[in-house]
């Protein structure tokens, strides 16, 4: 039989390149092809025998393996060396695949296939149900108004990704330590030993079961509040991370756990405690004329909307539903916790109303009738099992500052929001009662003993100055023809001196090292600042204004730099007022140092702006005492006593190796002026008219009506 000759080997054809085949476009089969050259990508040519077609392709499909990725075997008659040729062809394919992978790694362009895959994934995610998205999305968007934390979103599933901060034992313990150091002394709504046993020692919290939703929400709120009280340096030292990252992580965990615990439906006060801690930092700006200027605990700089102001109404309603004002039926421990929580809500309600400004949700009558302060004791004096009554302590305790704050909100409501309190006699009587209750708490207080004692010592003095300022310049706008008159010019304290004393105390906290732990808690209150500016505007004593203006200017700059979520009406009013005061005082106080006025509200250019005797002192240039009034004459306490009055009846000398003096303004309503030689140079009607215009501008800012310095 005649031997058949070898069959000619099938030639490798130049087929469409990889990219053109994927894009399904016609390829000119050049090397490189025109399409790849114009696209600026690497062209991967394809050279192989053509795949069988027709009857041959059908037969191959029937005989192909189940694995779709398996190579297709081409059944072609071949000579004895066909296996070697097939191996060579396979090696070439492998080399082409390797080249293709290398080119994909080196190329910055995304192939069509990758883009289509991404589009498919994105379109698939967009079709997921909204409830599933709530579980995957860790943040509360501004459009929800913060209602998600109330449990109104319809999803109660926890976000394990963001709640993991509670599972990180080391981070949660450090944040708890920060809370006990920076927050607990000034926001006293929790029992310190119980928190320590729970978060630092791993014991159960007040008998709650493990992983109870209320306890988890409280733990997350503690971490969140502690994170906001950190400085950037402290954040790096403790966590090796920026403060913003720690705050963002803690906030998401707090919102997640609050949503799970549902404050609207929870029957325990622990959830409300967590909710209040979340809200404390949230209200837009602390604007307290009795300058609390405190409790910036959670979202002030992050959420400048009115969401938290609205959520405050939920907290008040929840507190009433839990019967917090009465607190009956509990043991001694439960009664103390309820009283602390209710008065903290009243305080936040008062501060929030001043920051808008608006009427408080809790009326004066309701706040007065339900005012039952907790005991003046330390947390170590009682525990959850205490059933007997614990008497008050003398001297500084864990609750001293909070008790003063509760008295501040009670007096502030009477002086600012009670229409019936109009005559000078009743207003002075309210201030005197407030002073008697608060200054009594300073007895035996050594301001040099601890930073907390130092902070409490100076803040209480600041509160008393603020109460007197509220008696003279209430926040309530007077529409009648008979406004409240100021105190007698021969016996009354100086309005400007009171305002400057408050601003100086704020600077003291921000400059003295002993106030570092509480600086997050204290900002410049806008009411004393506005009063000081308006008094400088109408004051005729140029020498007095020259001494007072650097303090006012420094306070205004600090207010603008630190308060980013202030009310629009308040910000506009302060800007306009400052611009007008600068414009008026510029000719009389013009020196080499120029202060630039606001370009938005000032009608004149920078050439007409105010110049002051010297640049307002920076924080680094102020001495450790932080006393911006240190170069002025101060009157001693004995000089301010009335005839026959004993100094011991007014205050006790603190137990200290370096005795401290209470500010002279705090001894009596007819005390001498803060600035030596100062006289009352402003007529009562003109002084009141200046403040009345400031208050009216807050309510009538959109009307554009003319006034003495805001037009």
From Swiss-Prot:
<keyword id="KW-0804">Transcription</keyword>
<keyword id="KW-0539">Nucleus</keyword>
<dbReference type="GO" id="GO:0000981">
    <property type="term" value="F:DNA-binding transcription factor activity, RNA polymerase II-specific"/>
</dbReference>
<keyword id="KW-0479">Metal-binding</keyword>
<feature type="DNA-binding region" description="Zn(2)-C6 fungal-type">
    <location>
        <begin position="17"/>
        <end position="43"/>
    </location>
</feature>
<feature type="region of interest" description="Disordered">
    <location>
        <begin position="372"/>
        <end position="394"/>
    </location>
</feature>
<keyword id="KW-0805">Transcription regulation</keyword>
<protein>
    <recommendedName>
        <fullName>C6 finger domain transcription factor nscR</fullName>
    </recommendedName>
</protein>
<dbReference type="GO" id="GO:0008270">
    <property type="term" value="F:zinc ion binding"/>
</dbReference>
<dbReference type="Pfam" id="PF00172">
    <property type="entry name" value="Zn_clus"/>
</dbReference>
<dbReference type="InterPro" id="IPR050613">
    <property type="entry name" value="Sec_Metabolite_Reg"/>
</dbReference>
<comment type="function">
    <text>Transcription factor that specifically regulates the neosartoricin B biosynthesis gene cluster.</text>
</comment>
<dbReference type="InterPro" id="IPR001138">
    <property type="entry name" value="Zn2Cys6_DnaBD"/>
</dbReference>
<dbReference type="GO" id="GO:0003677">
    <property type="term" value="F:DNA binding"/>
</dbReference>
<dbReference type="InterPro" id="IPR036864">
    <property type="entry name" value="Zn2-C6_fun-type_DNA-bd_sf"/>
</dbReference>
<dbReference type="GO" id="GO:0005634">
    <property type="term" value="C:nucleus"/>
</dbReference>
<keyword id="KW-0238">DNA-binding</keyword>
